[in-house]
Amino acid sequence: MRLLAAVVIAVLLWGVGLFAFADRVRAITPAPEPAAADGIVALTGPSAERINAAVRLLEQGKGQRLLVSGVNREVRREELRALTPGSSRLFDCCVDLGFDAEDTMGNAQEIAAWARAKDFDSLIVVTSDYHMPRSLLEIRGMAPEVALTAHAVRTPSLDTANWWRSPADARRMALEYNKYLVVLARETVLGLTGRGEAEPQPEAA
């Protein structure tokens, strides 16, 4: 009986946390105009909108350089440049590509290494709305000395206001929440026991 009660309480707490997480995701878009930072980082995803949003911020002078983290190794620089708005000159001079990251933890390692190599103390982080909480948690774990500003991009295929009404949206939100909890637990343990860091280096422009 006690075990059943514990399970019920755990499920209820998880559900409350899920709704709080989803409300946080809903609230971060539309993204407000960010203050300028030393650099801008974009985490790649299923569409080019994250990169496009980051390039627009670079054009507005919101950062000195832009890192696109997690670029597919088969994608050439010229191909990526052709898919993004703005001038080729700006892309050539001020955009760095990171090819080592294969997941969000890899993005965080890549971003931390880039920020240290450039001696940047502040970054604007560009990624999808539902991906932002976990991304910030990962990056803060790898680069706690760097100030982060979130600039979330809305996911057109995800109704963040009514996600529970769609089985697909509910699955996506629950999966991302579970991933967030795993990272939160890991970062809590690492914060108590120490951390070893791997620092993959992004390609210089």
Write out the residue ranges for each language-model feature.
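N-terminal type II signal-anchor transmembrane helix
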Residues: M1-A31
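Alpha-helical structural elements
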Residues: I9, L158-D159, R172-L175
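Generic intrinsically disordered, low-complexity segments enriched for polar/acidic and small residues
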Residues: V11, V16-L18, T127, A174-Y177
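Generic signature of intrinsically disordered, low-complexity segments enriched in small/polar residues
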Residues: G17, L123, P133, Y180-V183
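A structural signal for short, hydrophobic/glycine-enriched beta-strand patches
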Residues: A22-P167
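C-terminal luminal/periplasmic domains and tails of membrane-associated envelope-modifying transferases
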Residues: A117, P202-A205
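A transmembrane-helix-recognition feature enriched in membrane-embedded lipid enzymes
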Residues: S166, A170-G196
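A nucleotide-sugar donor-handling region in carbohydrate enzymes
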Residues: G196-E197, A204
